[in-house]
């Protein structure tokens, strides 16, 4: 979003979307399609879309140039030894191979021969630079077993991100590359490739990645949760992905507003989710239609008595929103038989005057003994002052309307720790239960809502419709609770 803002609004420039598809073992067409779809959902329209694989020939030539100039070499050191040597600043035993030998092995890598598969190509930058990103990074490696989703089996070896990024950025005409601060150590490496290959300069602008408490953004760790079935997928409402927060109920206008307000700061901080969801509440509160839901568990039957009690069920049109008449009206049914939540019934005292929301006041005349409470009786007092009562309760008529089954879902953070360190064992910090569901009954007006609609259940909160009443065989509405910035 920041790239889109700076490209199109701040500087009247062009936004380029490039998909880095240099590892056929990890890249799939469905992933690239999901990225493009997510950007479209956020209203981001790149002026150009390209793939690193569009430039495989150019990258191959760049690697040849580095080898021929003595700035790259082939290395068959095993992964663990190479990692250890780089960490300790020790030169590889293959570092001084001749140019001719390196070119020969590069050809073997290209055809995927037995010898070629044992080797990689490393840039010959430094052995012991304090910045470990400069310690002879790998720039080409073999992968003959996985077909590339765009180039098939044409290539047996592929460039790494470290080589591909500066070469392709320069060639494609990128003027400003916005990179998160996790890549800051790689900036000198990026510049080394630009200078050594005599490429057009690219200006790098670092900004801090947006981090949140009790959340981790590592794709590798998130993939573990997906693969293990700990979450429902990449669009799970607990996931810190665009699709995840949208499924939780974040609106695109609120998301854009929040991100642009943060700006391209270099300060690395872990933010509380509160301000994120509070921004969303400002967006949805003025337009979310109000409805009622009563929990099915231990539901309490309420008998209405008194001269003002209706003889037969009747309905009235009431505003869907108390401050926004443009949203329309809903049908509210009144009768002698109501249902209320167990928690409300337990709070009542004999003789207490309460307010039955959208109807009026009533006196509690009887409360059935027992736990849970099964029934109560109330006498209407519609002349009573609703401002004088302590308790305002929601309710539904059990007569004169069809009550709609609903699932009310709520979600917790994935981890118990505010910030997960790199060395932390993920399993030890996973929240045991992160999704809870309660069955409820809603007023019949909710049957009109479809997936992604947002409503408010009075005294409960805001909910996004994950499945509409008619969207499936079960004839129920599935609702996901939307955080508001208070609590989780």
Regions found by a protein language model. Give the residues of each.
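Histidine-anchored nucleotide/phosphate-binding helix
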Residues: 1-12
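Anion (oxyanion) recognition and catalysis
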Residues: 9, 40, 67
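Alpha-helical scaffold elements adjacent to nucleotide-binding pockets in ATP/GTP-utilizing enzyme cores
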Residues: 34-38, 62-65, 189
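Long, charged, mostly alpha-helical binding arms that flank functional sites
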Residues: 202-279
């Amino acid at each position: 979003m920041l790239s889109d803002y700076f490209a199109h609004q701040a500087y009247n420039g062009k936004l380029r979307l490039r998909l880095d598809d240099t590892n056929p073992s990890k890249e799939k067409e469905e992933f690239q399609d999901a990225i493009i779809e997510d950007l479209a959902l956020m209203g981001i329209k790149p002026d150009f879309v390209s793939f690193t694989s569009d430039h495989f020939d150019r990258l191959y030539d760049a690697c040849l140039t580095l080898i021929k100039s003595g700035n790259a070499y082939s290395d068959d050191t095993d992964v663990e030894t190479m990692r250890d040597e780089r960490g300790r600043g020790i030169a590889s035993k293959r570092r001084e191979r001749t140019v001719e030998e390196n070119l020969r092995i590069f050809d073997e890598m290209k055809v995927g021969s037995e010898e070629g598969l044992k080797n990689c190509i490393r840039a010959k930058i430094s052995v012991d630079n304090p910045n470990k990103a400069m310690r002879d990074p790998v720039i080409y490696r073999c992968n003959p077993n996985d077909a590339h989703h765009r180039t098939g089996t044409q290539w047996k070896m592929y460039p790494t991100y470290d080589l591909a990024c500066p070469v392709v950025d320069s060639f494609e005409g990128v003027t400003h590359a916005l990179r998160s601060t996790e890549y800051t150590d790689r900036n000198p490496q990026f510049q080394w490739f630009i200078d050594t290959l005599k490429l057009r300069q690219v200006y790098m602008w670092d900004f801090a990645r947006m981090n949140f408490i009790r959340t981790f953004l590592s794709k590798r760790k998130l993939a573990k949760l997906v693969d293990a079935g700990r979450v429902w997928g990449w669009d799970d409402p607990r996931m810190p992905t665009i699709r995840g927060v949208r499924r939780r109920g974040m609106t695109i206008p609120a998301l854009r507003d929040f991100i642009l307000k943060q700006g391209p700061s270099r300060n690395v901080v872990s933010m509380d989710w509160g301000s994120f969801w509070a921004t969303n509440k400002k967006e949805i509160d003025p337009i979310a239609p109000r409805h009622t839901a009563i929990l099915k568990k231990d539901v309490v039957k309420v008998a209405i008595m008194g001269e003002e009690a209706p003889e037969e069920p009747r309905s009235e049109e009431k505003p869907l929103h108390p401050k926004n008449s443009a949203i329309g009206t809903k049908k509210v049914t009144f009768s002698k038989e109501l249902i209320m939540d167990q928690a409300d019934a337990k709070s009542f005292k004999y003789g207490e005057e309460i307010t039955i929301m959208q109807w009026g006041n009533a006196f509690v005349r009887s409360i059935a003994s027992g736990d849970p409470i099964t029934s109560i009786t109330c006498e209407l007092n519609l002349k009573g002052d609703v401002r004088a009562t302590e308790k305002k309760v929601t309710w539904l008529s059990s007569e004169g309307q069809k009550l709609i089954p609903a699932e009310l879902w709520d979600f917790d953070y994935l981890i118990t720790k505010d910030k997960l360190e790199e060395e932390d064992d993920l399993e030890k910090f996973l929240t045991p239960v992160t999704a809870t569901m309660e069955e409820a009954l809603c007023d019949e007006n909710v049957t009109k809502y479809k997936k992604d609609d947002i409503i408010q259940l009075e005294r409960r909160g805001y909910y996004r419709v994950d499945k509409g009443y008619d969207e499936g065989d079960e004839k129920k509405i599935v609702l996901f609770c939307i955080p508001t910035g208070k609590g989780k």
